[in-house]
């Protein structure tokens, strides 16, 4: 029989708030899918690894049998109400610290509400794109925008625990985005900033014209994001970079160029390129690999995927996160699946005699919470 290693304390180093509003079956189910869109006709997102994990872990906390029908679960959820459901599920995660990315739109709880509901400590992760948009709204000229942007980054650094960039390296307008190994020069930066501000103004005027206007947001220019990333790194806080579906190899030049600058890089949500992310973390002392979304998305296969990551990355370079957004169920599933999967992998090595139980417990603590406490200065 395979031994299991308990994973006690967790620091969720990247997550989002939960919705304050009630959800019907269709809207709840859509949030189980990666695209946050309805399932194809005749199918359901409950028939995914995430869906089965939700049905396994969540119903008992609401007083139901595990794997009960989704309709029964949603009915009980509505009966208890959003606040009580969130409280029960978040407190059952066993997460002691939530690092909350506050950049998502929607009626989501912030760090203070997350801390209250979960009985945890919560700190804010500042999304650079949102910071740029807020500054643009209050700056009348390009010069004023650039000055105010620099001040805003430094002000945010005084209270935030990290910065993050929401634009993946996967695609911008359908083309691969390369994260530049250097910031744009002053002249080029002014041109790029002016172009972005002009496009925002065009969109604002179009939206005011009503249904015929385009409306919508304007994606931050890639070179302006390069400037923002380097400005954020100068503050010394960790910088989280979302990989999306991109191969982390696209970040190799950036990782090499930023080594020795006093800022750690955390590669977020690398699955299905998790092995490449782990390898990059192994090559650079300031690069870390996040395990977020692997347990929830791979479900019963989570232990196998985690074992692949542990083959390549030093154990001190791996961080847990749920990556959860909108649904407290995803917070719970991320934590429960991670604990079970890591416990099984390490326990198997103990059973085989490859590791001692003491070493397995030490590594479990490192990955679950210790590494994050060190990287984000939570100790």
Q: Model-predicted segments: where are they?
A:
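Conserved, mostly hydrophobic/aromatic
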Residues: 14, 98, 163, 232, ...
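Active-site beta-loop-alpha junctions enriched in small/polar residues
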Residues: 16, 103, 127-133, 166-170, ...
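H/E-rich (His + Asp/Glu) clusters that bind or coordinate divalent metals
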Residues: 261-379
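Short catalytic/ligand-binding loop motif for oxyanion handling, primarily in non-cytosolic enzymes
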Residues: 18-22, 106-110, 133-134, 170-175, ...
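Mid-to-C-terminal alpha-helical segments outside catalytic/metal-binding sites
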Residues: 1-13, 19-64, 71-77, 315-317, ...
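A gly/proline- and charged-residue-enriched helix-loop-helix capping module
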Residues: 126-147
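Histidine/acidic residue-rich metal-binding segments in metalloenzymes
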Residues: 144-165, 172-287, 301-319, 337
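Alpha-helical scaffold segments that flank or form the walls of functional sites
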Residues: 26-118, 124, 147-158
């Amino acid at each position: 029989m395979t031994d299991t290693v308990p994973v006690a304390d967790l620091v969720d180093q990247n997550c989002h708030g939960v919705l304050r509003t009630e959800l019907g079956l269709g809207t709840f189910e859509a949030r189980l899918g990666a695209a946050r869109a309805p399932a194809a006709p005749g199918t359901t997102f409950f028939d995914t690894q995430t869906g089965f994990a939700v049905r396994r872990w969540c119903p008992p906390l609401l007083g139901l049998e595990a794997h009960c029908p989704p309709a029964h679960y949603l009915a009980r959820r509505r009966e208890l109400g959003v606040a009580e459901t969130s409280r029960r599920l978040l407190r059952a995660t066993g997460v002691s610290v939530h690092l909350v990315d506050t950049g998502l739109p929607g009626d989501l709880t912030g760090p203070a509400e997350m801390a209250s509901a979960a009985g945890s400590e919560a700190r804010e992760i500042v999304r650079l794109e949102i910071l740029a948009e807020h500054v643009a709204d209050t700056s009348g000229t390009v010069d004023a925008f650039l000055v105010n942007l620099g001040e805003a980054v430094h002000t945010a650094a005084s209270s935030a625990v990290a910065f993050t960039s929401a634009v993946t390296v996967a695609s911008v307008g359908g083309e691969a985005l390369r994260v530049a190994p250097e910031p744009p020069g002053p002249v080029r930066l002014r041109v790029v900033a002016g172009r972005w501000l002009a496009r925002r103004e065009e969109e604002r005027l179009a939206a005011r014209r009503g249904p015929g206007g385009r409306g919508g947001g304007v994606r931050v220019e890639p070179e302006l994001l390069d400037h923002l990333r380097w400005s954020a790194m100068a503050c010394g806080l960790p910088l989280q970079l979302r990989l999306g579906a991109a191969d982390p190899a696209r970040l190799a030049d950036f990782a090499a160029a930023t080594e020795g600058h006093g800022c750690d890089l955390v590669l977020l949500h690398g699955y299905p390129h998790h092995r490449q992310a782990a390898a990059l973390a192994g090559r650079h002392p300031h690069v870390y690999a996040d395990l977020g979304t692997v347990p929830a998305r791979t479900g019963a296969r989570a232990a196998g995927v985690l074992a692949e990551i542990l083959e390549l990355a030093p154990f001190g370079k791996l961080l847990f996160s749920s990556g959860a957004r909108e649904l407290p169920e995803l917070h719970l599933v991320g934590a429960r699946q991670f604990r079970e999967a890591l416990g099984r992998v390490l326990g198997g090595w103990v059973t085989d005699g490859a590791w001692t139980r003491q070493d397995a417990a030490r590594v479990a603590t490192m990955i679950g919470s210790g590494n994050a406490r060190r990287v984000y200065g939570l100790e």
